[in-house]
Amino acid sequence: MRQLLPGDTVWRNIRLATMDPQRQAPYGLVDNQALIVREGHICDIVPETQLPVSGDNIHDMQGRLVTPGLIDCHTHLVFAGNRAAEWEQRLNGASYQHISAQGGGINATVSATRACAEEPLYLLARERMMRLASEGVTLLEIKSGYGLELATEEKLLRVAAKLAAENAIDISPTLLAAHATPAEYRDDPDGYITLVCETMIPQLWQKGLFDAVDLFCESVGFNVAQSERVLQTAKALGIPVKGHVEQLSLLGGAQLLSRYQGLSADHIEYLDEAGVAAMRDGGTVGVLLPGAFYFLRERQRPPVELLRRYQVPVAVASDFNPGTSPFCSLHLAMNMACVQFGLTPEEVWAGVTRHAARALGRQATHGQIRAGYRADFVVWDAEQPVEIVYEPGRNPLYQRVYRGQIS
């Protein structure tokens, strides 16, 4: 009989989808095992016969499915306002250029976010965070990028820090100051990049407000030379980097990111084979964002077969934002990734667990159920992991465990 220590907690009578690639079964499934949790981490996975059937801190899950906590590795969670009226205009035939000329597009969100005080901005973001937590998310990336000036970018990152301090969900904050050119720099995007590189990145990094730097390398964002200035600045300070690349066109952003050992290349609908090979060589995760693909009614799909062939890890995320993916649901993104991009349910599960953890630099502690990893996991009223992907309108979450505590 396995000896338990005071304070140990056990989950028994479970079907365990570990997502551990070292296990041979699909999803890393094991049966007739129990989880021992100690001090917020997974202490061990042992045969049920080695443990008492009942006792203090022993939870009988009656055969329910247990998976790692979900990880949403790409969100724009902190913003004010919405773009519903603009979406209706687009559906009625208005062009993006026409909407932008009227003050719409990303700068509409920037204006609303700049004008919003920190407390109401926090309350808006907190409600969104809790929606994701209710789906089983235990680690969440939050980007800035709707300030495009030092004060508001800092405000967005302070909101992310306040959310993290609630200890309800892990937050990975990202500085996305190079998201778009603000209206006041419309005729001087290089000048804006200078502001980002010489002021925003070093000052906000010194304050400890973010974990990584992101950018938007695209024809409607920043060109390759401007993007490389951002990457050079970040790398000189030892800051991990990532990027929105190859979403609307092929500029070579994925190859650029990979030269800087980017954590992830996100969107990647127009990614080519040279970019895929560079991502493999640079250890860069491909993050698929099917919500934006759907909402923008795009036609160019990411090169999933190439990513498989080159064995590039693929993550899936919600990309929750007001302009191109207003879906605060990782479950929906999981389903869309299967239906629209052709991922298998097992690939999607890897994409919201171990590969998503890698996209955030957390692969040594998150995204799998194995000894030594954080005790972040979800108990589902389900028998198979595919059930959560198959029916996105139904949430079979039974219990969410964060840092070893039922939450």
Curated annotation (Swiss-Prot):
Belongs to the metallo-dependent hydrolases superfamily. HutI family. It comes from the Bacteria. Its cofactor is Zn(2+); Fe(3+). Catalyzes the hydrolytic cleavage of the carbon-nitrogen bond in imidazolone-5-propanoate to yield N-formimidoyl-L-glutamate. It is the third step in the universal histidine degradation pathway. Pathway: Amino-acid degradation; L-histidine degradation into L-glutamate; N-formimidoyl-L-glutamate from L-histidine: step 3/3. 4-imidazolone-5-propanoate binds at R83, Y146, H179, Q247, T324. Binds 1 zinc or iron ion per subunit. This is Imidazolonepropionase.
